[in-house]
């Protein structure tokens, strides 16, 4: 599969960041987790009660979404319509569910809309 153009990637990444934002907001409401969600441009920040954060941003030159969490730094690349970890192959929402659960201390399952 050829790489996307820069504008194609930016549109795809922007849509995915919006989807993540909506998904986290909905899941947090369902389990009464207190997560502050903020977005500025291509950076989505999730802040938890203990002050810890998860930061998700798009990296256009690499055509990846990068996630910084207490568990570490992770790179996700689009593959067959899904964002997968470039090292482990884990799907983005599975990984984010674990990171959000760890940092919120509430069992959170994220399912993309």
From Swiss-Prot:
Gene3D superfamilies listed in its UniProt record: Frataxin/CyaY (3.30.920.10)
Gene Ontology biological process terms in this record: iron-sulfur cluster assembly
Keywords for the protein's UniProt record, in alphabetical order: Iron, Metal-binding
Keyword Transmembrane: no
Pfam families registered for this protein in UniProt: Frataxin_Cyay (PF01491)
InterPro entries named in the record: CyaY, Frataxin/CyaY, Frataxin/CyaY_sf, Frataxin_CS
MF terms in GO: ferric iron binding; ferrous iron binding
SUPFAM superfamilies, A to Z: Frataxin/Nqo15-like
A GO cellular component entry from the record: cytosol
PANTHER family, per database record: FRATAXIN, FRATAXIN, MITOCHONDRIAL
Family: Belongs to the frataxin family.
Function of the protein: Involved in iron-sulfur (Fe-S) cluster assembly. May act as a regulator of Fe-S biogenesis.
NCBIfam families, alphabetized: FeS_CyaY
Name used for this protein in its record: Iron-sulfur cluster assembly protein CyaY
Species the sequence originates in: Ralstonia nicotianae (strain ATCC BAA-1114 / GMI1000)
């Amino acid at each position: 599969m050829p790489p996307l153009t820069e504008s194609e990637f930016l549109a795809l990444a922007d849509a995915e960041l919006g989807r993540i934002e909506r998904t986290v907001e909905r899941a947090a409401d369902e389990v009464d987790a207190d997560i502050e969600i903020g977005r500025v441009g291509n950076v989505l920040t999730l802040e938890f009660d203990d002050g810890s954060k998860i930061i998700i941003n798009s990296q256009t030159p690499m055509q990846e979404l990068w996630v910084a969490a207490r568990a570490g730094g992770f790179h996700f690349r689009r593959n067959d319509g899904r964002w997968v970890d470039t090292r482990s192959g884990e799907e983005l929402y599975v990984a984010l569910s674990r990171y959000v659960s760890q940092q919120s201390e509430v069992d959170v399952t994220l399912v993309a809309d």
